[in-house]
Structure formats: C-alpha cells, structure tokens
C-alpha cells in the first residue's frame, strides 16, 4: 500500500520567490544544508540532501507549480517513484505552498510526512527570517 501526504505552509516571501528558491541549487542548499542538483527543465534529473532524495522534473509552470517524480535512497528496490506536486500561490505579501506527495510507501510515510516539516518548512522559515 501507498499513502498520500498533504501539507500547506505560508512563508514570509512571495509565491514567485519561494518557487525560485526551491529551483535554485544555491538557495535550496542554503535552506536545507544539503547539496542539491535541480533545474526547472522537464525531464531533468534532480537530487537533494547529497543524493538521499532523487528523481526527475516532470512539469513546471513558472512561479506557480512544480511536479517531480521523487524517491528516497532508503526506499526498497520494488517501491515505485512517488509524485510530488508543489503549488505556489500568493497570500497577501506572503506566499503559500500547497504540497501533495502521492504514492509514498507505507514503510516511509512517517519519515516523509515529518521530513517535509523538519527538513523544509522549519529551515525555510528560519532562512527567510535572516534574509
């Protein structure tokens, strides 16, 4: 069985800025602390946290949407890739990210669900408070 993660976060930057930060290897690394290879080009490979997360870009809408095929290095060989959808929308002077992460293997659901909060949303909020 697989599971679905849904999360929303509002951060003190515009939706366009948040989109650009996620797709900038330099800023993404500054936020998360791990090496990142990423591009907005559909079909391009990406990796984060020094290769612990990897996949490919499926689709982007500049400033608004990122869709990735995504998997963790800790997943079993037979586990299918998951699909990550990040939607960026304005919320006043802030930006909102709505995340849908589908096809998460049962054995890593808790890790993925908590990982978004621990390794992305909290560090991103901290990064933005300093910049």
What are these regions (language model features)?
Residues 1-37:
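Hydrophobic ligand-binding cavity/cleft-lining segments
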Residues 5-7, 84-86, 97:
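Hydrophobic residues positioned within well-ordered beta-strands of beta-sheet architectures
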Residues 13, 45-48, 111:
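Alpha-helical scaffold segments that form or flank carboxylate-/histidine-based iron centers
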Residues 22, 69-70, 116, 121:
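Tryptophan-centric aromatic hotspots in well-structured domains and transmembrane helices
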Residues 29, 36-37, 47, 51-94, ...:
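Hydrophobic-ligand binding "helix-grip"
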Residues 103-131:
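A conserved amphipathic terminal alpha-helix motif
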